[in-house]
Amino acid sequence: QPLQEDDLFVFVACDDHQRVVGSILFSKLSFPNEENVFLLAPVAVATKWHGQGIGQALIRFGLEALKTKGVSIVMTYGDIRFYSKVGFTAINEERIQAPLTLSYPEGWLAQSLTGKAITPISGKPTCLEAIANPIYW
């Protein structure tokens, strides 16, 4: 299905010279029952800028922006040691399935933006075609 206006959000961080030093992307995870769930991927920060909190600041900013858009849950797939710093917790696929087979199931993470506990969502979601490649999962 074609991408809708509110299906994709991109945020960037720039240095003092307006050069991009970090970026994040949130895209809609489409479930059969129309849940309002987004996927955070990828998160990228220029090597020179690692360890300065840019990725965390971008993620926090993006999560707040999605909250104002009525997004209820954000998922991501990665290192719990990093993503737990911005509120993500591990979740198993019995509660929310990933769009593709996970090579590292411990890296499937979720965050509620409503303050409510995350309840199970039925059905397998689809993601953007650009990341619907098993190599990323």
Task: List PLM regions with ranges.
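C-terminal "cap" of GNAT-fold acetyltransferases
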Residues: 97-137
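Conserved acetyl-CoA-binding loop-helix of GNAT-fold acetyltransferases
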Residues: 40, 45, 51-64, 75-76
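Short loop segments at secondary-structure junctions
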Residues: 15-18, 48, 112-117
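Non-catalytic interaction surface on structured domains
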Residues: 6, 17, 21, 46-54, ...
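A conserved beta-turn-beta hairpin within the catalytic core of GNAT-like acetyltransferases
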Residues: 29-40, 50
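Active-site rim helix/loop that mediates acceptor-substrate recognition in acyltransferases
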Residues: 1-25, 29
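Conserved active-site alpha-helix within GNAT-family acetyltransferase domains
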Residues: 68-72, 78-103
